[in-house]
Amino acid sequence: MDKYTKIKHLFEQNRDEENAIKMSKYMRDLFKFYGLATPIRKSFYKDLLKEEKVSKVVDWDFLDKCYEDDYREFQYLVMDYLVTMQKYLTYDDVSKIFKYIKSKQWWDTIDGLDRIVGNIAFKDERINDLMLKWSKDEDFWVRRIAIDHQLCRKEKN
């Protein structure tokens, strides 16, 4: 069983319908949820993240499959994965992350992705020109990333 299927199976087996309804309502019914509390959700892929970190290779096919899933917990998994692997993310990965920024947009994912982009900015100054371009984008969420990615810089200075 591949890692996506294994995690999906765990999410489905542990679904909390009552909590899923509340979570969806909180997000204005924009997304479906399994209703998993954060500690429970993270426990299902904690070991996977450890293994991935040891491999030092970002599995973009796995991440794409997760991000495309209809349930919001999978987008959260992608963000947790990217945070775990941020040491290995480079400027060249920003185009892949941009696909996530443009898809299933809402505060929860955008505010997580801006920190990931912000951490890449510490390693590569080319991000500065890209963020200037994004700051003029017609998409509100892309502009938000361009502005908010700087929060990491404030914390480091």
What does each of the following model-derived ranges do?
Residues 1-157:
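Alpha-helical scaffold domains
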